[in-house]
Amino acid sequence: MKLHDLKPALGAHRKRKRIGRGIGSGKGKTGGKGMMGQKARSGPNPSPSFEGGQMRITRKMPKLRGFKNRWRIEYQIINTGQLNNVPDGTELTINAMIEQGWVQPAKPVKILGDGELERKLTIHAHKFSASARARIEAAGGAAIETPWIVERRSRSRGPNPPRHHRKAEATPGA
């Protein structure tokens, strides 16, 4: 027996039913689209919020308007008052905050100025509020911003390289 002699078993492949080819075919006349209303016609359907000309509920109620910004960056917040249990003179990096269980590695970290800071700390974070920076520097410490690099995944080629690598790859002979 050779590969070209192989055939599927009888009844394994059912023939495709052609739609709209007469009422005797089993899928004729309306072709599986039900009664012939607007949604049975060719072309796009009305939007999900369309109510046949009646004022739609999304326009009646202001709270249902607007949109969700897909590029919004949601920060994890740490207040300066929470940093008083760290020993004096410590360099507090983002990795140290992750090890302490204060933040998760998936989102950027922002330090806010709620609460007094009594320790001299060098703090690394992605963002600082103006009041937090002032409190850290008033206590004799330093606020160092580290960039937040987002790795957006593309479906075809895996994760995209970070921005600072892209220019080096693009320039020939570099």
Swiss-Prot record:
Disulfide bonds: none annotated. Residues 1-56, 150-174 are annotated as: Disordered. Residues 21-35 have a biased composition (Gly residues). InterPro entries: Ribosomal_uL15, Ribosomal_uL15/eL18, Ribosomal_uL15/eL18_sf, Ribosomal_uL15_bac-type, Ribosomal_uL15_CS. Keywords: Ribonucleoprotein, Ribosomal protein, RNA-binding, rRNA-binding. It comes from the Bacteria. One of its GO terms (cellular component) is cytosolic large ribosomal subunit. PROSITE patterns: RIBOSOMAL_L15. One of its GO terms (molecular function) is rRNA binding. GO terms for biological process: translation. It holds the Pfam family Ribosomal_L27A. NCBIfam families: rplO_bact. Belongs to the universal ribosomal protein uL15 family. Binds to the 23S rRNA. Part of the 50S ribosomal subunit. This is Large ribosomal subunit protein uL15. It comes from Roseiflexus castenholzii (strain DSM 13941 / HLO8). The gene is rplO.
